[in-house]
């Protein structure tokens, strides 16, 4: 699948109390192309149930599920994987998941990290944070100019993350982001209908470019 558009990322705090599945389905209905399941807890049984349900939703809507930092779970479900800099070997993940799996890598604001990730077989390169982020307030910043340099340097699609909103996303897309990763500006919503509306608005930004 073409890696372009809205990349929705779950948040266990925002999507507690039964909101996970209806809010995610709303995002998919609104056009999210990739969905990252991000849950850092050690509740393995619950995480497996949720990931299975999310995989089925993604299949229904023609989207792709990406698991954050859990190679074993990604392999078990036959889905993609996102790895941070401390989350294990990308080349080992590629060897296990195979050549067609979507495997993304966090590169922060460093082209050197992206060089290594690209060499190890990353499907996409994620840069950020570009703006103040409530999810990861202490994450190192990345510059908008970095996106332009990365776009000229790498064939892999670029993901922009960190404080992305409908107001600042257009600049990220203009600078070279093929995907915009969104958490709060998508899921911090009053209801599922609002999530769908926000997802459609983010998707329209790509239609306008």
Curated annotation (Swiss-Prot):
Which Gene3D superfamilies is this protein grouped with?
Aldolase class I
Q: Which GO terms describe its biological process?
A: thiamine biosynthetic process; thiamine diphosphate biosynthetic process
Q: What is its EC number?
A: 2.5.1.3
Which residues are 2-[(2R,5Z)-2-carboxy-4-methylthiazol-5(2H)-ylidene]ethyl phosphate-binding?
Answer: 133-135, 163
- Co-factor remark: Binds 1 Mg(2+) ion per subunit.
Identify which cofactors the protein needs according to its UniProt entry: Mg(2+)
Which Gene Ontology terms of cellular component type are present?
cytoplasm
Instruction: Tell me what reaction this enzyme catalyses.
Output: 2-[(2R,5Z)-2-carboxy-4-methylthiazol-5(2H)-ylidene]ethyl phosphate + 4-amino-2-methyl-5-(diphosphooxymethyl)pyrimidine + 2 H(+) = thiamine phosphate + CO2 + diphosphate; 2-(2-carboxy-4-methylthiazol-5-yl)ethyl phosphate + 4-amino-2-methyl-5-(diphosphooxymethyl)pyrimidine + 2 H(+) = thiamine phosphate + CO2 + diphosphate; 4-methyl-5-(2-phosphooxyethyl)-thiazole + 4-amino-2-methyl-5-(diphosphooxymethyl)pyrimidine + H(+) = thiamine phosphate + diphosphate
Which SUPFAM superfamilies does this chain map to?
Thiamin phosphate synthase (SSF51391)
MF GO annotations: magnesium ion binding; thiamine-phosphate diphosphorylase activity
Binding of Mg(2+): at which residues?
A: 69, 87
Similarity comment: family membership: Belongs to the thiamine-phosphate synthase family.
Q: What does this protein do?
A: Condenses 4-methyl-5-(beta-hydroxyethyl)thiazole monophosphate (THZ-P) and 2-methyl-4-amino-5-hydroxymethyl pyrimidine pyrophosphate (HMP-PP) to form thiamine monophosphate (TMP).
Protein name in UniProt:
Thiamine-phosphate synthase
Q: Which organism is it from?
A: Azotobacter vinelandii (strain DJ / ATCC BAA-1303)
